[in-house]
């Protein structure tokens, strides 16, 4: 968890950000979004980068009926978001101003965790709402194959009252076709609060490296400012 400078939970509540790393639902690391979290904490947000169970194929085959590798990831993301919101007072977090997102598989997980009302852990407090004030998706891994399982198919769970959404993609990314299909469905539903940035000549994960890490985070900064979550101009990113 990353806090703003001189943050005092007893005196003020800051907007929040929780990001889920990518890794094809089987790998990846919390380290992916540490720079992003450190940056937005420096700008005034309480930030967290969250993990989830990453099952091998062998482990996934042992899951009981009604569960799958991706379903488990979504359930874990719901638990992480609920925990973050439950700790709002101690963290100095405004639970009504929480941005949720991630990269690749993490973006897919973040979408389903908030849009799909099921796949909850029964041990979690179901009365803790997990609707975000905005989405932040870095090349979200939305697959046409997900149509085979309605519970993990983002298109099945889009809602007309979707929160403002910011999306980044490289035009050489093979996953962009999945986003294009989801975006077309959003347009057909007149979901217009979507801003997307397509980087020419870039492939999957381009945002992890400079100069694109800076340009994408600064674009997200300006997006948050337009939503009233931040003030001022973007600043320099922290060093690694």
Question: What are the roles of these predicted feature ranges?
Answer:
Residues 180-183, 187-240:
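C-terminal catalytic histidine-bearing segment of alpha/beta-hydrolase fold enzymes
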Residues 144, 171-177:
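Acidic catalytic loop of the alpha/beta-hydrolase fold
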Residues 11-23:
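Short beta-strand element of the alpha/beta-hydrolase
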Residues 79-160:
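Primarily recognizes the serine-hydrolase "nucleophile elbow" in alpha/beta-hydrolase
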Residues 66-90, 218:
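Alpha/beta-hydrolase active-site loop
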Residues 1-12, 91, 154-159:
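Short beta-strand-to-loop junctions in surface cap/lid or active-site-entrance loops
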Residues 30-50:
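Short amphipathic alpha-helix adjacent to the substrate-entry channel of hydrolases
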Residues 161, 166-169:
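Short beta-strand/loop motif that positions the catalytic acidic residue
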């Amino acid at each position: 968890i990353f806090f703003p400078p001189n943050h005092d939970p007893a005196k003020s509540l800051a907007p929040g950000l929780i990001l889920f790393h990518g890794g094809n639902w089987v790998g990846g690391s919390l380290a992916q979004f540490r720079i992003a979290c450190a940056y937005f904490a420096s700008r005034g947000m309480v930030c967290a980068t969250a993990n989830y169970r990453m099952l091998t194929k062998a482990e996934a085959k042992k899951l009981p009926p009604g569960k799958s590798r991706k379903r488990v990831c979504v359930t874990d993301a719901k638990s992480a978001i609920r925990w973050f919101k439950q700790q709002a007072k101690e963290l100095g977090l405004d639970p009504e101003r929480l941005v949720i997102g991630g990269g690749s598989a993490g973006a897919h997980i973040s979408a389903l965790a908030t849009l799909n009302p099921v796949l909850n852990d029964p041990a979690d407090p179901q009365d803790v709402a997990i609707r975000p004030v905005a989405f932040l998706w870095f090349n979200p891994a939305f697959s046409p194959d997900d149509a085979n399982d309605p519970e993990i198919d983002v298109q099945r769970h889009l809602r007309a009252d979707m929160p403002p959404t910011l999306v980044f993609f490289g035009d050489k990314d093979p996953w962009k076709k999945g986003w294009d299909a989801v975006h077309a469905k959003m347009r057909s539903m007149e979901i217009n609060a979507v801003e997307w940035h397509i980087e020419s000549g870039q492939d999957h994960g381009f945002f992890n490296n400079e100069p694109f890490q800076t340009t994408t985070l600064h674009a997200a900064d300006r997006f948050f400012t337009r939503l009233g979550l931040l003030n001022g101009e973007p600043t320099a990113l922290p060093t690694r």
